């Protein structure tokens, strides 16, 4: 079991009960992105955070990335590199970007919630 468990209930409470995000999404403000789709996104990102991203947290904490300024590069472990690649390939980083840039328009609060889960699961991998 991972060190990280996303608190989806708290996130959904803040987004849909405290903030009027559901109404804005269901009104078509963000195209096809509605409240149900936003909840599905949160669920999928939580799985990515809990499983893939959190898996290498301890290893990355014990063997952090090293910046080599003279060589203009960093070194990271193979396991962390795999995690970074999988998080990137999931393409949730596109959430909130303009469609012309290959993104999916989304409210900042939803983008924040997805990023919070990934960063909390493994800061080194995001």
Map each language-model feature to its residues.
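Amphipathic, small/basic residue-rich leader segments at the start of a protein or domain
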Residues: 1-126
């Amino acid at each position: 079991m991972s060190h990280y468990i996303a608190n989806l209930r708290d996130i959904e409470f803040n987004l849909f009960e405290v903030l009027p995000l559901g109404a804005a999404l269901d009104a078509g403000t963000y195209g096809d992105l509605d409240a149900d789709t936003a909840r599905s996104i949160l669920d999928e990102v939580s799985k990515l955070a809990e499983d893939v991203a959190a898996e290498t947290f301890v290893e990355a904490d014990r063997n952090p990335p090293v910046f080599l300024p003279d060589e203009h590069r960093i070194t990271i472990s193979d396991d962390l590199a795999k995690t970074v690649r999988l998080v990137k390939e999931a393409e949730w980083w596109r959430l909130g970007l303009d469609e012309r840039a290959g993104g999916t328009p989304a409210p900042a609060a939803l983008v924040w919630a997805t990023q919070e889960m990934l960063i909390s699961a493994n800061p080194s991998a995001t």
